[in-house]
Amino acid sequence: MALLLDTGPWVALLSRNDTHHRWAVEQFRRLTPPLLSCEAVVAETCFLLARAGFDPALALQFIERGVVQLPFALQDQISAVRALLKRYDNVPASLADAALIRLAEVHDSPLLITTDSDFHIYRRHGRQTIPLITP
């Protein structure tokens, strides 16, 4: 199984005043690293942490320690990601969302931890739901 990490749970874990903080703490206790993500999620996480008054470097420590790994290379997946952005332009999907959908497509058994309800809409390979851990 490939555990995929979205922005929401990562921010919630590091931000004690986040609505989903307790839920995120419990999930991170249960999940076995590494969690896979992408640089777009890292950028969103750092931005949201800074905006909430937290040190964005806290998120980077997860990468340094190997808790979060970034196996996704946008350059290698650009055509597929562009197609996903176009497909979900009515939602709309962010770059991070499209990258995570693609990451779910390239793994046989993905499980995505997210607080984003849009992932109930998104499909991998056109029709397959993405297995989720949500609050």
Tell where the protein language model's regions lie, with residue ranges.
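Metal-dependent nucleic-acid phosphoesterase active-site entry motif
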Residues: M1-D18
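Short, ordered loop/turn segments at secondary-structure junctions
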Residues: S117
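Charged, low-complexity surface patches
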Residues: N17, R51, A93
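Conserved glycosyltransferase catalytic-site signature
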Residues: S94-A98
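PIN-domain endoribonuclease scaffold, especially VapC-family toxins
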Residues: A2-L3, R22-N90, R102, V106-I113, ...
